[in-house]
Amino acid sequence: MENIDIRGARTHNLKNINLTIPRNKLVVITGLSGSGKSSLAFDTLYAEGQRRYVESLSAYARQFLSLMEKPDVDSIEGLSPAISIEQKSTSHNPRSTVGTITEIYDYLRLLFARVGEPRCPDHNVPLTAQTISQMVDKVLSLPEDSKMMLLAPVVKNRKGEHVKILENIAAQGYIRARIDGEICDLSDPPKLALQKKHTIEVVVDRFKVRSDLATRLAESFETALELSGGTAIVAEMDNPKAEELVFSANFACPHCGYSVPELEPRLFSFNNPAGACPTCDGLGVQQYFDEDRVVQNPTISLAGGAVKGWDRRNFYYYQMLTSLAKHYHFDVEAPYESLPKKIQHIIMHGSGKEEIEFQYMNDRGDVVIRKHPFEGILNNMARRYKETESMSVREELAKNISNRPCIDCGGSRLRPEARNVYIGRTNLPIIAEKSIGETLEFFTALSLTGQKAQIAEKILKEIRERLQFLVNVGLNYLSLSRSAETLSGGEAQRIRLASQIGAGLVGVMYVLDEPSIGLHQRDNERLLNTLIHLRNLGNTVIVVEHDEDAIRAADHIIDIGPGAGVHGGQVIAQGNADEIMLNPNSITGKFLSGADKIEIPKKRTALDKKKWLKLKGASGNNLKNVNLDIPVGLFTCVTGVSGSGKSTLINDTLFPLAQNALNRAEKTDYAPYQSIEGLEHFDKVIDINQSPIGRTPRSNPATYTGLFTPIRELFAGVPEARARGYNPGRFSFNVRGGRCEACQGDGVLKVEMHFLPDVYVPCDQCKGKRYNRETLEIRYKGKTIHQVLDMTVEEAREFFDAIPMIARKLQTLMDVGLSYIRLGQSSTTLSGGEAQRVKLATELSKRDTGKTLYILDEPTTGLHFADIKQLLEVLHRLRDQGNTIVVIEHNLDVIKTADWIVDLGPEGGSGGGQIIATGTPEQVAKVTSSHTARFLKPILEKP
């Protein structure tokens, strides 16, 4: 079959569509956010492809696999087995890294186990077991007639007089020994000091190097090795300072006897006890109680609560501090930061062995005096954390814990034996820390010889190929040691994509969700080439995408619309880019042809040169002591290639610092910096990201935006409700009273089917309406609470027109383009872009002071050109009210409308971390060293 034929697809908002998709082509599905793209690609095509494959397995095997729900579709023909590559972050397991996900680390373990050279950590000499023949050949290669002696070390750096050993050597017929570097006669050995360490080496043979000595040397080496237990030394007789040759017949260091077991791949695994660092168990980090977190506010006194739980309200611990203050003569009422550093150290870390007189008052008012050392607040917390059985105490103490690199392995996660195995001059931790681009260069240049080259040939081929695939999808800036939980959705998706290319499957249907997220325009071409390569292997590649380059590169485009939600779900246009542009109904076509576009502002908002937010000396991750200046009251875009340090600078440094200072929240961790000034221009900071607005089906836009409370109050105010004594809680489906108890307000019942997918059936008591009959008898303007929750935002806006408090919130949801979502729609069904816009609308509906700092990370994710246009209008409106907007973005339509740009680079990873350009878009476009400028310039010059 040449096509995939879909007949009567009705999943979610799809309107009974019939569609023919060409097989073995690159197909892009595009359309407004919420128009039904994911419903078609993931919930119909992928779900059915996956379901058919799983159903071909035995019932026993099926119970171990998560089955997809059968999509609401009449028929699909021509489907292949389906693989979906989504944006979900890969893993929350701290042991999962880029290297382990891509399986490159497994090949590296094998490589080091087979061709690695173990070394002694103290003497840096290779641990190689040598044969007697190799030892003899080495000695015979020395200059002819060199006067040498062969020594057998019998005592190495051991205390004692060693009388018995010296007598024993002499009894065996040996005449001389080198004791502590001096040649001595064994007939009259020196008396050795009992408490000093000594080294005794027996002189087994003295000789001049000649070619006919081979047999004699072999016998002498045999004697020396037997005497010493496997070690022999060859030294010059006339020059005691000359370098000595040390030989070992064991797999051990000839100097100190350090040895390792036979190298196996598991020795290099931090997930295996054989290879994991014993101190941190292979996690690379250690938890500790952090003084910066414990001292919540150093400007106030200990009595006033500088340390939570140790102030005057907590009598037991406060008594300790007052006794401590009496002993060391400091004032518990003084600001903590004014106390001498020595006193602060004692308070935190304890008094050591020094005993202090503590006065304790018991419940009866009796004073008890006890003398003992003070353990210190940090040690006290660590002990209680370990000993307590109370979860609430443990959770409270955990707020003071931070992570730091393990002191033993330095964050490499491996035990010393594994860290000291080298290929050339490089060990495994060094390779894991390099960027993927640098690692590829290292392995491309690596040349092994002889037997090692033969052993490593296939392993190196696999490593190089996998690294090349990661570089091809624009991930050259990541390192193999990067923890999987720190990856963005786009990065995780591209790693999966690279792994799939490595698998080299043919005849598969790949379904991808916006793989260009987080990618700079510069890297887009490489990503598209990767998708084309997947197609050329003989696969059908279906991509949900809004990126213009991807749409133009597609063999076939499907435009879903015309609107979003209930207004979408139809195929508006399909064909190649030229055919889409000619279709008058296609919104995408209008943007591609230039008939509709996002305009460049006629003039930029004026800069107030006196008002700046200045962050100095930011040095987290790859940032190179960056000084960031953001103009207050403007719309600033932070740009730069993937991995240049944008997220570290804004999300890991600026946002937590501003949050700690302005929002009075729990202290959050921030990356290292020197100083920050200008926060006085703001009264709050808000981070609007794409994380879900709620993780349970009970959470919905009405509850998140605060709409549901006034709606419930309205229903409770209806005369009938007042007559029955119903309060607003009666109209909540989360608490007993008004909800249907058969389904506990869910509206559906879950039926577990074991080796079939779980089935959700409407509750037979409330028929899916979530409330009991009595509650549904209350009507406001003829509608029940269930009917109101089932309204779209647009319908509700009209219905509640006379209630300003509700109408204003609904209007902001419409302003951000969410007129189509239902008030009671489960938040788990919202896309990332929709969740972000619900948050944006919630902020917009609040009374505005004009002094808010808004931070957004790639707000255009999941948004169509038309959605972006609407989003920009909202952001510009916030800016016009005096607020400051900081956006991390790659989308050129957003960048060109910014008032100010901060461009990081020049490259990703270690090649980035610097500010390359700042200024208006027109000023930045002139900077030749900026990759962003190269793509921005032609757009600004377009008529």
Curated annotation (Swiss-Prot):
<dbReference type="InterPro" id="IPR004602">
    <property type="entry name" value="UvrA"/>
</dbReference>
<feature type="zinc finger region" description="C4-type">
    <location>
        <begin position="253"/>
        <end position="280"/>
    </location>
</feature>
<keyword id="KW-0862">Zinc</keyword>
<feature type="zinc finger region" description="C4-type">
    <location>
        <begin position="740"/>
        <end position="766"/>
    </location>
</feature>
<feature type="binding site">
    <location>
        <begin position="640"/>
        <end position="647"/>
    </location>
    <ligand>
        <name>ATP</name>
    </ligand>
</feature>
<dbReference type="GO" id="GO:0008270">
    <property type="term" value="F:zinc ion binding"/>
</dbReference>
<keyword id="KW-0267">Excision nuclease</keyword>
<dbReference type="GO" id="GO:0009380">
    <property type="term" value="C:excinuclease repair complex"/>
</dbReference>
<keyword id="KW-0547">Nucleotide-binding</keyword>
<keyword id="KW-0863">Zinc-finger</keyword>
<comment type="subunit">
    <text>Forms a heterotetramer with UvrB during the search for lesions.</text>
</comment>
<feature type="binding site">
    <location>
        <begin position="31"/>
        <end position="38"/>
    </location>
    <ligand>
        <name>ATP</name>
    </ligand>
</feature>
<protein>
    <recommendedName>
        <fullName>UvrABC system protein A</fullName>
    </recommendedName>
</protein>
<dbReference type="GO" id="GO:0006289">
    <property type="term" value="P:nucleotide-excision repair"/>
</dbReference>
<dbReference type="GO" id="GO:0009381">
    <property type="term" value="F:excinuclease ABC activity"/>
</dbReference>
<dbReference type="GO" id="GO:0016887">
    <property type="term" value="F:ATP hydrolysis activity"/>
</dbReference>
<feature type="domain" description="ABC transporter 2">
    <location>
        <begin position="607"/>
        <end position="937"/>
    </location>
</feature>
<keyword id="KW-0742">SOS response</keyword>
<keyword id="KW-0067">ATP-binding</keyword>
<keyword id="KW-0234">DNA repair</keyword>
<dbReference type="InterPro" id="IPR017871">
    <property type="entry name" value="ABC_transporter-like_CS"/>
</dbReference>
<keyword id="KW-0677">Repeat</keyword>
<dbReference type="GO" id="GO:0005524">
    <property type="term" value="F:ATP binding"/>
</dbReference>
<dbReference type="Pfam" id="PF17755">
    <property type="entry name" value="UvrA_DNA-bind"/>
</dbReference>
<dbReference type="InterPro" id="IPR003439">
    <property type="entry name" value="ABC_transporter-like_ATP-bd"/>
</dbReference>
<dbReference type="GO" id="GO:0009432">
    <property type="term" value="P:SOS response"/>
</dbReference>
<keyword id="KW-0227">DNA damage</keyword>
<dbReference type="GO" id="GO:0005737">
    <property type="term" value="C:cytoplasm"/>
</dbReference>
<keyword id="KW-0963">Cytoplasm</keyword>
<keyword id="KW-0479">Metal-binding</keyword>
<dbReference type="InterPro" id="IPR027417">
    <property type="entry name" value="P-loop_NTPase"/>
</dbReference>
<keyword id="KW-0238">DNA-binding</keyword>
<dbReference type="Pfam" id="PF17760">
    <property type="entry name" value="UvrA_inter"/>
</dbReference>
<dbReference type="InterPro" id="IPR041102">
    <property type="entry name" value="UvrA_inter"/>
</dbReference>
<feature type="domain" description="ABC transporter 1">
    <location>
        <begin position="310"/>
        <end position="587"/>
    </location>
</feature>
<dbReference type="GO" id="GO:0003677">
    <property type="term" value="F:DNA binding"/>
</dbReference>
<comment type="similarity">
    <text>Belongs to the ABC transporter superfamily. UvrA family.</text>
</comment>
<keyword id="KW-0228">DNA excision</keyword>
<dbReference type="InterPro" id="IPR041552">
    <property type="entry name" value="UvrA_DNA-bd"/>
</dbReference>
<comment type="function">
    <text>The UvrABC repair system catalyzes the recognition and processing of DNA lesions. UvrA is an ATPase and a DNA-binding protein. A damage recognition complex composed of 2 UvrA and 2 UvrB subunits scans DNA for abnormalities. When the presence of a lesion has been verified by UvrB, the UvrA molecules dissociate.</text>
</comment>
